[in-house]
Amino acid sequence: MLRTMLKSKIHRATVTQADLHYVGSVTIDADLMDAADLLEGEQVTIVDIDNGARLVTYAITGERGSGVIGINGAAAHLVHPGDLVILIAYGTMEEAEARAYQPRIVFVDADNKPVDLGHDPAFVPDFEIAGAAELLDPRIVAR
C-alpha cells in the first residue's frame, strides 16, 4: 500500500508579494527550497494562518537570499502580502519507506530566513534560537 506522508514544511513564512496576473504558482526563495527539499514544479499546499485559506499549487524558484514568498495567479485573491503561511509538500511512498522517512521542517524568521531545520513536525523551536519567539503562537508566548 502507498502512503501519502509529509515530506516538506516551511513553517510561518511571511508572504512578501502577490501577483494576480501571473500564471499561477508560489515563488519561494531558492534557499528555502533547498532547505525544505522542494523542487521547481513540485506540488505544494499553502495554508494561510491569518484567514484559514488552503490551496494547492506548485513551487517556482525565487531569487536566492531574497526571502521571497510570492503568491501568483488566482491564489492572490485568497492569500495576501503580510499573511503568515505554512507551505507543505507531501510524498507518496511504500509503507516501509514511510515508517522510516524523516520530513524536512523549516522554521523561518520575520524575513523568511531559516532559523531552525528539523524532522519532527510537532517540534517548536525554543526561545534561544534567534527569532524563535516570533514563531510561536502568541497564546503560548503570553503564558
Swiss-Prot record:
It catalyses: L-aspartate + H(+) = beta-alanine + CO2. It is found in: Cytoplasm. SUPFAM superfamilies: ADC-like. Its cofactor is pyruvate. GO terms for cellular component: cytosol. Its main location: cytoplasm. This is Aspartate 1-decarboxylase. The lineage of its organism: Bacteria, Bacillati, Actinomycetota, Actinomycetes, Mycobacteriales.
